[in-house]
Amino acid sequence: MSKAYLFIYDSNVGTREELKSVLNRMQRVSTWRFDVPSCFYVISEYSAQQLYDEFVSLNGTKGRFMFIEASDNRQGQMLPETWYLLTNKQHKPK
């Protein structure tokens, strides 16, 4: 079963471009998107621990970061595409 995560990081972890490359190489990541600084929305069938382990194997432990599951208890000012991804665990059809 797919889960939605927020991947939150500081600038010591890497640039957005570097992290896009890491997420694209992660076999445990189904898809992802971003629309705010220092945060990616990640979809995966794996646990936060498993995502962490794979991320560290590719990028190391530099900086501060975390994968945190996005529950249904959420609200905010986000783009419709972000809400769709978090709710449906896939990108909104074009």
Model-derived features with residue positions:
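Short, surface-exposed loop and linker segments with low hydrophobicity and enrichment for Pro/Ser/Thr
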Residues: M1-Y5, T61, P93
